[in-house]
């Protein structure tokens, strides 16, 4: 009996010594979302993988994963603060050379860029006297797109604007877009006469202009707020949703569009000119969604800087949709100056006013 106890104690001391030497260097962790981008409230999966590359079984491994604030995990009543990360705790028994994969269903209710930043693992010694802690860092992200605004009030407004600028293009003739020539009837203005073609034909010929050119618009999103104007969080978020809604409307009408904004995209040190080239199609639209999802309400320029950007990058768009949280003297002046400077129709859309109109319509 004494020999058995000595052997048992010796064996326990050896296991305790080995467990104390375990510093988790053989434990690898990876956590990834199954989608790069989602709609607000859309369910996606978070896949966590734990791999033990060592030759020792770890009977007790407590894992605290760092998830973004606002994350809702299906089946778990978590009231997480939108602004703070929260810890999702689980306990594992992991054998040597074993990989454990766990999948959870989750969703995020608000637009933004969310990070899965790693985990903290805690393991105990063999006798359960001590705990060891190690932090594993990573940075996987998921982008939540701005919400699509499906209000009839907004759709009617966009339809009216579309009808307006699509008709206006017929009022001005572009001398570059000549599709063909025809005989002069006497009703055409003198500037329509092609003297070169007339000389070839020995009678007057006039130019016919091509009006089937692609329409193009600029979505100009201004999120600049002076510190004295307050936060206006709801109105700012509404601007992002308006930009997404306009882009989707233009996709349906097969109108090329681009986005210009003074908002920071992603990290505060990353200034973006957004989707600054006009285009359309699924790839262009998806790029715009990710841009809007990552954008913050922090700005790199004032209203005046935004005006300079638009004038510099103007390329003959038929219309400019100017989006801002609310109207003020500075913004009204910007709209007037753009209207006078550029050969485009400028449509101001102020979130505060539209929110009021939507509520009244409902």
Residue ranges and their predicted role:
Residues 186-362:
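Exposed, interaction-prone extracellular/peripheral surfaces
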Residues 11-269:
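An amphipathic, basic-hydrophobic helix/alpha-beta surface used to engage anionic
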Residues 1, 158-159, 166, 353-362:
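Generic structural signal for short, solvent-exposed loop/turn connectors between secondary structure elements
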Residues 1-8:
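Membrane-targeting alpha-helical segments
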């Amino acid at each position: 009996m004494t020999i058995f106890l000595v052997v048992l104690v010796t064996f326990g001391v050896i296991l305790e010594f080995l467990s104390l030497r375990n510093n988790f260097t053989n434990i690898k962790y990876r956590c990834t979302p199954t989608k790069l981008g989602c709609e607000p409230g859309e369910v996606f999966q978070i896949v966590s993988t734990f791999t033990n590359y060592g030759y020792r079984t770890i009977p007790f491994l407590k894992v605290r994963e760092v998830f973004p604030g606002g994350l809702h995990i299906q089946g778990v009543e978590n009231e997480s603060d939108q602004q703070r990360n929260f810890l999702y705790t689980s306990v594992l028994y992991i054998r040597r050379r074993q990989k454990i994969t766990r999948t959870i269903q989750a969703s995020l209710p608000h637009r933004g860029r969310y990070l899965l930043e790693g985990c903290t693992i805690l393991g105990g010694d063999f006798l359960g006297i001590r705990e060891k802690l190690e932090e594993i860092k990573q940075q996987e992200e998921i982008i939540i797109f701005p919400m699509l605004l499906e209000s009839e009030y907004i759709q009617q407004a966009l339809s009216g604007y579309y009808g307006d600028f699509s008709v206006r293009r017929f009022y001005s003739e572009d001398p570059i877009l000549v599709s063909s020539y025809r005989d002069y009837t006497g009703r055409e203005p003198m500037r329509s006469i092609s003297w070169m073609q007339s000389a070839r034909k020995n009678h007057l010929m006039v130019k016919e202009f091509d009006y089937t050119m692609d329409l193009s618009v600029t979505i100009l999103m201004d999120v600049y707020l002076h510190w004295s104007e307050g936060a206006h969080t709801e109105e700012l978020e509404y601007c992002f949703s308006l930009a997404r809604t306009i882009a989707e409307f233009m996709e349906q009408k097969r109108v090329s569009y681009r986005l210009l904004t003074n908002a920071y995209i992603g990290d505060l040190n990353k200034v973006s000119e957004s989707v600054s080239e006009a285009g359309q199609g699924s790839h262009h639209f998806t790029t715009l969604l990710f841009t809007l999802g990552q954008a913050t309400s922090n700005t790199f320029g004032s209203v005046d800087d935004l005006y300079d950007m638009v004038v510099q990058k103007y390329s003959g768009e038929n219309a400019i949709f100017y989006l801002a949280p609310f109207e003020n003297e500075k913004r009204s002046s910007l709209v007037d100056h753009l209207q006078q400077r550029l050969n485009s129709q400028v449509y101001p859309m102020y979130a505060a006013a539209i929110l009021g109109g939507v509520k009244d319509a409902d």
